[in-house]
Amino acid sequence: MEYQYPLDLDWTNDEMMKVIHFFNKIENYYEASVKGDEVLNAYKNFKHIVPGKADEKQIFKEFENKSGYNSYKVVQEIKKNPNQTLFSKDFD
């Protein structure tokens, strides 16, 4: 699937890489599987770059519109299942 990640050109290269890394973890959830702690660590880094809830919602919506992947759903599922290690859309 070809699409661009929702990035802010005011971010540093390091910040852009952290946001892309987070979205890569979301892609892994939908396309294969991913460890919950990896997603939460990537999300924590994402939140340092995008601390505002409104900005987060906008970026998540842009990503979902382009990719079809719901970042919010993935993060919430992982937070609700702290004892589970591996996550995938096929596991729900």
From Swiss-Prot:
It comes from the Bacteria. It holds the Pfam family UPF0223. HAMAP family: UPF0223. Belongs to the UPF0223 family. This is UPF0223 protein SERP0684. It comes from Staphylococcus epidermidis (strain ATCC 35984 / DSM 28319 / BCRC 17069 / CCUG 31568 / BM 3577 / RP62A).
